[in-house]
């Protein structure tokens, strides 16, 4: 990713940076509108995900996570910005005339060829089942359920690693550090997701974050008691509790949020860090 630093002409541009090369020019048959009305609320209008709302209008890009164009080579025509994710996307023109978007693999350039199938080369951007990959292969867009499409390691810079194969299962090390079992028949894409330096981009001002649909963050200790367990008191008061809590009174900072007795507990060999 080519990051362009602004000249220091104003306080906001002094600390700002933008991506200077990747643009967005989506195809009409691969996009559709989506209605944003929740703004972090549930069906009753109660905030369940904080600091969300507003933002620029978006058109959703149809991403091919299944990669079911088997044994048909495709050429990367464009590399585009997607407002719905922090990774870039590639427009692929397949030999049979099909056109689809896929996640941009790191290092892929316009003109490269990608293909999916069972007996394809182990090269960047190709999709194939885990059973046909050698151990130590770096992969992304990994399926959990056969035929459902990739669900793991899809964010910018994400990469998983195939570390073992035994019986009907393959062992993967995920970006979170979790080690789990997945069926060897599930497919994945070779390589790492692009836009690795997304965390190096500085927005520079509050307005840029508003365009992304992110609202300001307010500390609970400066709120009223009716709004947060940390609120209230005279002046700068401590939280008044032994341990910090969420706005709903649950323990914060380290409390495990995964549901107990999930079906996939037996597939996780080592929980995430």
Curated annotation (Swiss-Prot):
One cellular-component annotation, GO: mitochondrial large ribosomal subunit
Subcellular location as annotated: Plastid, Chloroplast
Keyword line: Chloroplast, Plastid, Ribonucleoprotein, Ribosomal protein
GO molecular function: rRNA binding; structural constituent of ribosome; transferase activity
InterPro entries: NA-bd_OB-fold, Rib_uL2_dom2, Ribosomal_uL2, Ribosomal_uL2_bac/org-type, Ribosomal_uL2_C, Ribosomal_uL2_CS, Ribosomal_uL2_dom3, Ribosomal_uL2_RNA-bd_dom
Disulphides: none
Feature: compositional bias, Polar residues: 7-26
GO biological process, one term: mitochondrial translation
PROSITE patterns named among the record's database cross-references: RIBOSOMAL_L2
Family from the record: Belongs to the universal ribosomal protein uL2 family.
PANTHER family, per database record: LARGE RIBOSOMAL SUBUNIT PROTEIN UL2M, RIBOSOMAL PROTEIN L2
Quaternary organization: Part of the 50S ribosomal subunit.
Name used for this protein in its record: Large ribosomal subunit protein uL2cz/uL2cy
Taxonomic source organism: Ceratophyllum demersum
Gene: rpl2-A
